[in-house]
Amino acid sequence: NPDELQMGGRRAQITTLFADVRGFTSFGEKYEPEQLVSILNRYLSVAANAVLEQEGTIDKFLGDAIMAWFNAPIPQQDHPLRAVKAALAMMHAIDTLHGELESEFHLSFGVGIHYGAAVLGLIGNKMRLDYTAIGDSVTTAKRIQENAAGGQILISNDIYQMISGQVKASPVEPIQAKGKSQPIRVY
């Protein structure tokens, strides 16, 4: 019953992952919508499976992108590492997918990962509700993803500090992200 649902949510510390299929808009100019949906679903399935294998929560699909988070609703001590493992699994699964697809359908993901506080809850109105994560940390993860090249995983300095002994990562030039007053250090 929509009248009984409470808007808003609860604050949580989460690791947010965004993965976007690079070049899909221009790719879309060449093919019929049915073919686009078929190809896009193959790529989004790869991303979704990688997130679920690491026990992440898929928030939503945003056109040619996926938004997911870790450490909620079930706490995970190793949530930053799980997000990075999911991103790496996406990249490996895409290599496999490319073996199944003609080269004209070879696309790649740009991935961004960040950690911080967010509110998880119902957003919208009684006619249309979404359960989602909202907060600066979520926006920052999105901005990091927007700066990742195809086939690239960018993690924030916060994530790097949490997993530095467990993964190999190199610093890249800090990014000046839209809406951010300070550059974001990424690896």
Where do the model's predicted regions map?
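Allosteric regulatory "coupling" segments in signal-transduction proteins
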Residues: 80, 128-134, 171-175
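Alpha-helical scaffold within the catalytic cores of cyclic-nucleotide enzymes
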Residues: 40-56, 72-111, 115, 136-146
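Acidic/histidine metal-binding catalytic segments
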Residues: 62-63, 102-112, 152-159
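Intrinsically disordered or compositionally simple regulatory linkers and C-terminal tails
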Residues: 1-8, 184-187
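A structural signal for short, well-ordered beta-strand segments
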Residues: 16, 66, 109-115, 186
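Cytosolic regulatory/linker segments at or just downstream of nucleotide-handling modules
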Residues: 118-120, 147-187
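Catalytic NTP-binding/metal-coordinating core of nucleotidyl cyclase/transferase enzymes
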Residues: 4-86
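Catalytic strand-loop-helix junctions within cyclic-nucleotide turnover domains
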Residues: 69-79, 111-130, 150-152
